[in-house]
């Protein structure tokens, strides 16, 4: 990292030449994050289960002349995560940024929620983020440098009246506390750990929702009256992934169109 006194303002937000891992990168927010990092000059490993989708993302990234590694990975499988991190360290030489984005959402009334659904939510949304942070953390501790950006949700602090999101909100609350605990543990090691709390954003999952009452609830509940667009999270991600946030750690950055202020 450049010395603070030598840096110009544009350098603070630069990720040029940095090496990043983005999980859940085959679609939605993860895809946007990976392409954004590449556009800004970072080398990127893209991880997800759907290899064919990752190859499509790689075609977009290749336009920017950076190194891109496609890494098939199920974040509930620790051996696959270890293999991804080992490959990234070998191919990149170091790992500067982890965008811990992979997640799933199963919405159902609590009394109807099956054990399998609960375990799937926990395995993906909590365990997967922890396993990736743990393995990447081993590399970052050797470097005495790293930026970990967990993707949580505004549902870690509020919920939506009448919507059965107990399991989902529980996992995102866990991500917030995991972020704080890791940030405190690694604060003196040059590693920052923060979490972004998106509100309702356009995604593959949201596109499948056809309940107008539900959509109306989102529009009426959000002061901006709409869902966010994936690109509207890129600024927050770049801030936390760059040296602009070098004195920021353990924080929740809400990007929710004002949902949590009312």
Task: Locate each region found by the language model.
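Alpha-helical segment proximal to the catalytic Tyr-Lys
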Residues: 138, 184-188, 246
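Short C-terminal tail/terminal secondary-structure segment
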Residues: 6-14, 238, 249-262
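Substrate-binding pocket helix/loop in short-chain dehydrogenase/reductase
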Residues: 109-110, 114-122, 164, 206, ...
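Residue(s) in the substrate-gating loop at a strand-loop-helix junction
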Residues: 153
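Active-site helix of classical SDR
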Residues: 133, 171, 179
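Conserved glycine-rich cofactor-binding loop
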Residues: 26-27
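A conserved structural motif in NAD(P)-dependent oxidoreductases
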Residues: 222-233, 244
């Amino acid at each position: 990292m450049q010395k603070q006194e030598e840096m110009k303002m544009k350098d603070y937000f630069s990720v040029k030449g940095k090496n990043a891992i983005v999980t859940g990168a085959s679609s939605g927010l993860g895809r946007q994050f990976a392409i954004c990092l590449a556009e800004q000059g970072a080398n990127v490993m893209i991880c997800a289960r759907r290899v064919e989708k990752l190859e499509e993302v790689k075609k977009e990234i290749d336009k920017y002349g950076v190194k891109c590694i496609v890494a098939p990975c199920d974040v509930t499988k620790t051996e696959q995560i270890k293999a991804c991190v080992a490959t990234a360290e070998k191919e990149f030489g170091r790992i500067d940024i982890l965008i811990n984005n992979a997640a799933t959402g199963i919405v159902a009334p609590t009394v109807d929620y099956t054990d399998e659904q609960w375990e799937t939510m926990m395995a993906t949304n909590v365990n997967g983020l922890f396993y990736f942070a743990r393995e990447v953390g081993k590399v970052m501790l050797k470097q005495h440098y790293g930026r970990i950006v967990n993707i949580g949700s505004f549902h870690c602090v509020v919920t939506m009246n009448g919507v059965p999101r107990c399991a989902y909100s529980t996992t995102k609350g866990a991500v917030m506390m995991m972020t704080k605990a890791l940030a405190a543990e690694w604060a003196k090691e040059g590693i920052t750990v923060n979490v972004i709390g998106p509100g309702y954003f356009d995604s593959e999952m949201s596109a499948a929702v056809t309940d107008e009452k539900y959509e109306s609830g989102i529009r009426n509940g959000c002061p901006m009256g709409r869902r966010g667009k994936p690109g509207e999270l890129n600024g927050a991600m770049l801030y936390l992934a760059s040296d602009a946030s070098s004195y920021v750690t353990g924080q929740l950055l809400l990007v929710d169109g004002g949902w949590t202020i009312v």
